[in-house]
Every structure is written in structure tokens, then in C-alpha cells.
């Protein structure tokens, strides 16, 4: 059974994702695939809403590693077929299986099409004393071909950065020494371009606390700020985005905000 909720930019479909994609999503039509699958935590993930006296949950328990990897492999293969030649795929995971999923992505897409490992870093609090506190998740980025679309993002310089000094142009003098490039009046040549700092692969974005306004009651909901950044890297307005697992629906909301 399929259940649809649709507006001008978002379509939510309740169905077996692999079957639906095979039958209804056109090959080579998708610009961005974002997957936030079960993490192989071997737990039932539950989010309880006290005010509504109800809970939302999904089962992340598997018979074995092979069952889990076979499930993800089938999804990745179908997703690859739906991606256009400039598309990127982002796979969200944690330490439960990130090492396994990297190998699986190499298998499906090819080692040469690996682009980045994003580390989503955040603050968490725990009384655990038996190991280091878990405070990050991983997002693997792969492309379908070498002709992928990638849009650079720049962040602000730190307050202590001397921006003018960074942007001043340099050259080598007659002795091969690097010196500031100067105008005819001996002033230092600068530039009007101040794009900022290129985005790194470590993203420090707050984890959604239980009382966050954007919380919808789904146990593994991701922040809109995180998802918007993924879209901004890989998409232009009106590009097609595919989220096979959907979860809380936050990617669709993020895409709507950015008019994708």
C-alpha cells in the first residue's frame, strides 16, 4: 500500500523503498540521494512524546551482519541507477557500521568515486565511564561519475583572524623570496574577494535536544541545519532529491526551505 502526502515541492510515500524506486523513479533523474538508514545498532529505537502520551519507534535489530548489508546493498544499487551523472550520494551512519558501509559503498560505486568523510560533531552528555563519549556521526559522500556537481560553501573567518593579511597578494622577488605584491605607489595589493573559509569535513552542528522546536517525535531525527548544508553542496533550485528512508521528513522540509 502506498500513502502519499504532496505539495508543490515535496512528496512523501509510504511504501517499500526499493520496490517503489524501481517502479516509479525515473533512471538518471536524481541529483542528490541522502540515506539515513538504520545504523545496525541492534536495538529498537523509540522516541516517547509525553505531551501526546504516545511513542514512535522502528526496529534496528538484525539476524546478522550479512542480512543488514544485503538490505543496504540492494538500496544502494537502485539509488545508483536513479542518479544522474552529476549526482552525489550521502550515506549517514555511526560507529555501529560505518566501517562496513564504507566498504559497501566502494563495492557499489567504486573506490575512485569516494569524495569525503563528513564528521558531524556535537555535544552529548553521559555518565559512561567505560569508554570515550560518543560525540559524532559519519556521512560518506560518493559520486556516480567524475563529472559530479559540487558547490563550494564558505564559512566566516574566526574573530581572531587577520582577514586583510590573508587576502593580501604575494609574489617572489628577484631573489626568490616571497614578498607582498605592491602597487606603483608601494601600497600592498589586496583583493576585494572575501569569500570566507572553505567548508571543512568536520561539521560542528548541535544535536537536537528533546525540547528543540523542530522536534517532531521521531527517534533519530537530524537537524535541518545539517540537511540544508548537504543540499546546498550538491543541488541547484528545482533539482530532484531522493530520500529512501525519510524518517522524520526533515530532508523534505529542508529542501522546501531551499526551493529544491
Where are these regions (language model features)?
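Core catalytic lobe of class I
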Residues: 1-260
Amino acid at each position: 500500500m502506498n500513502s502519499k502526502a504532496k505539495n508543490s515541492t515535496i512528496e512523501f510515500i509510504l511504501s517499500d523503498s526499493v520496490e517503489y524506486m524501481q517502479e516509479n523513479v525515473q533512471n538518471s533523474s536524481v541529483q542528490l540521494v541522502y540515506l539515513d538508514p538504520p545504523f545496525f545498532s541492534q536495538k529498537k529505537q523509540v522516541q516517547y512524546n509525553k505531551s501526546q502520551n504516545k511513542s514512535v519507534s522502528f526496529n534496528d535489530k538484525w539476524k546478522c551482519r550479512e542480512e543488514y548489508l544485503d538490505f543496504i546493498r540492494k538500496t544502494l544499487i537502485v539509488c545508483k541507477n536513479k542518479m544522474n551523472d552529476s549526482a552525489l550520494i550521502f550515506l549517514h551512519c555511526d560507529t555501529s557500521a560505518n566501517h562496513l558501509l564504507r566498504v559497501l559503498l566502494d563495492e557499489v560505486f567504486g573506490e575512485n568515486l569516494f569524495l569525503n568523510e563528513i564528521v558531524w560533531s556535537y555535544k552529548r552528555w553521559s555518565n559512561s565511564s567505560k569508554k570515550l563519549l560518543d560525540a559524532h556521526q559519519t556521512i560518506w559522500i560518493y559520486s556516480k561519475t567524475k563529472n559530479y556537481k559540487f558547490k563550494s560553501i564558505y564559512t566566516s573567518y574566526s574573530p581572531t583572524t587577520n582577514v586583510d593579511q590573508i587576502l593580501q597578494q604575494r609574489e617572489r622577488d628577484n631573489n626568490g623570496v616571497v614578498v607582498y605584491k605592491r602597487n606603483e605607489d608601494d601600497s600592498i595589493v589586496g583583493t576585494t574577494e572575501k569569500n570566507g573559509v572553505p567548508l571543512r569535513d568536520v561539521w560542528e552542528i548541535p544535536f537536537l535536544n528533546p525540547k528543540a522546536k523542530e522536534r517532531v517525535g521521531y527517534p533519530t531525527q537530524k537537524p535541518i541545519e545539517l540537511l540544508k548544508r548537504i543540499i546546498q553542496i550538491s543541488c541547484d533550485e528545482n533539482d530532484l532529491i531522493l530520500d529512501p528512508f525519510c524518517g522524520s521528513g526533515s530532508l523534505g522540509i529542508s529542501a522546501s526551505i531551499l526551493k529544491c
